[in-house]
UniProtKB/Swiss-Prot annotation:
<feature type="glycosylation site" description="N-linked (GlcNAc...) asparagine">
    <location>
        <position position="8"/>
    </location>
</feature>
<dbReference type="InterPro" id="IPR017452">
    <property type="entry name" value="GPCR_Rhodpsn_7TM"/>
</dbReference>
<dbReference type="GO" id="GO:0007186">
    <property type="term" value="P:G protein-coupled receptor signaling pathway"/>
</dbReference>
<dbReference type="GO" id="GO:0008020">
    <property type="term" value="F:G protein-coupled photoreceptor activity"/>
</dbReference>
<keyword id="KW-1133">Transmembrane helix</keyword>
<keyword id="KW-0297">G-protein coupled receptor</keyword>
<dbReference type="GO" id="GO:0007601">
    <property type="term" value="P:visual perception"/>
</dbReference>
<protein>
    <recommendedName>
        <fullName>Visual pigment-like receptor peropsin</fullName>
    </recommendedName>
</protein>
<dbReference type="GO" id="GO:0071482">
    <property type="term" value="P:cellular response to light stimulus"/>
</dbReference>
<feature type="modified residue" description="N6-(retinylidene)lysine">
    <location>
        <position position="284"/>
    </location>
</feature>
<dbReference type="InterPro" id="IPR000276">
    <property type="entry name" value="GPCR_Rhodpsn"/>
</dbReference>
<keyword id="KW-0325">Glycoprotein</keyword>
<feature type="transmembrane region" description="Helical; Name=1">
    <location>
        <begin position="27"/>
        <end position="49"/>
    </location>
</feature>
<dbReference type="GO" id="GO:0005886">
    <property type="term" value="C:plasma membrane"/>
</dbReference>
<feature type="transmembrane region" description="Helical; Name=7">
    <location>
        <begin position="273"/>
        <end position="297"/>
    </location>
</feature>
<feature type="topological domain" description="Extracellular">
    <location>
        <begin position="265"/>
        <end position="272"/>
    </location>
</feature>
<feature type="transmembrane region" description="Helical; Name=6">
    <location>
        <begin position="241"/>
        <end position="264"/>
    </location>
</feature>
Length: 337
């Protein structure tokens, strides 16, 4: 049935499968095209900065690099396919395309949530438990990063093999979890995803950043040398950047979670069409505001970006080894990531 529906003409889909007019589709398509271009360009610049300046290749930034990869993945696949379908007036890429599109968006989205959790754990171990942080090696960070990617892959594959399903949303121009079919399979999948990939990560992040904040307050009020204050200033920059990213993650994914919860415990037919399209758009929005957060909240990254635009081949960034926490700030080297 879904395959047949996806094969219908643009006109019939606009009448039967989409709750939006073509003008509304065009507005969404314009947004997607602009946001996609900004996201791809900005995240490529982010990767270029990390590649160019070895001073930025720290364990925490290795996680940020992977976040940039997830953003590029959504921008290069999710935005173009959805924009093309909006311009067409209905889903343009058939049943297989729907599965690939929705699966990749869930894959990159869940991976980014996992990576943000890893950043929070890294900040906690680096600042609050430096003795543990010192023992974290290349394999430790690789394992944490791979865990985030594997988690994303698992939840992306489940609807394809039968736990819930992917289908076009009410606009008919994008594919996602089929929340209009709120059967037992959908409800169990949705509740598990929200618990494991929303509630648990937020709990871990809150715990980590709460204790990080206490540690930073303690050290900033103590009588420290200038070099110690400089090291803590760097740590505060990285932590501030991480906290802003978490807050924006909450803003981005909350509408989508609300839609899924509404569909699970209420009547999916009563979900307002604007909310149905705003939810996935919000979820994708982190792809273009994350690079802005790196620039605004991190002085080292900001200096590196300016240096790259000035075509400087090397940027002087003093790396200190005074504090135990320097494990998470030293450039990547053999034996450490």
């Amino acid at each position: 049935m879904l395959r047949n529906n996806l094969g219908n003409s643009s006109d019939s889909k606009n009448e039967d499968g989409s709750v939006f007019s073509q003008t509304e589709h065009n507005i969404v398509a314009t947004y997607l095209i602009m946001a996609g271009m900004i996201s791809i360009i900005s995240n490529i610049i982010v990767l270029g900065i990390f590649i160019k300046y070895k001073e930025l290749r720290t364990p925490t930034n290795a996680i940020i690099i992977n976040l940039a990869v997830t953003d590029i993945g959504v921008s290069s696949i999710g935005y173009p396919m959805s924009a093309a379908s909006d311009l067409y007036g209905s889903w343009k890429f058939g049943y297989a395309g729907c599965q690939v599109y929705a699966g990749l968006n869930i894959f990159f989205g869940m991976a980014s949530i996992g990576l943000l959790t890893v950043v929070a754990v890294d900040r906690y171990l680096t600042i609050c438990l430096p003795d543990v942080g010192r023992r974290m090696t290349t394999n430790t960070y690789i394992g944490l990063i791979l865990g985030a990617w594997i988690n994303g892959l698992f939840w992306a594959l489940m609807p394809i093999i039968g736990w819930a399903s992917y289908a076009p949303d009410p606009t008919g121009a994008t594919c996602t979890i089929n929340w209009r079919k709120n059967d037992r399979s959908f409800v169990s999948y949705t509740m598990t995803v929200i618990a494991i990939n929303f509630i648990v990560p937020l709990t871990v992040m809150f715990y980590c950043y709460y204790h990080v904040t206490l540690s930073i307050k303690h050290h900033t009020t103590s009588d420290c040398t200038e070099s110690l204050n400089r090291d803590w200033s760097d740590q505060i920059d990285v932590t501030k950047m991480s906290v802003i990213m978490i807050c924006m993650f909450l803003v981005a994914w909350s509408p989508y979670s609300i839609v899924c919860l509404w569909a699970s415990f209420g009547d999916p037919k009563k979900i307002p069409p604007p909310m149905a399209i705003i939810a996935p758009l919000f979820a994708k929005s982190s792809t273009f505001y994350n690079p802005c957060i790196y620039v605004v909240a991190n002085k080292k990254f900001r200096r590196a970006m300016l240096a790259m635009f000035k075509c400087q081949t090397h940027q002087t960034m003093p790396v200190t080894s005074i504090l135990p926490m320097d494990v998470s700030q030293n450039p990547l080297a053999s034996g450490r990531i």
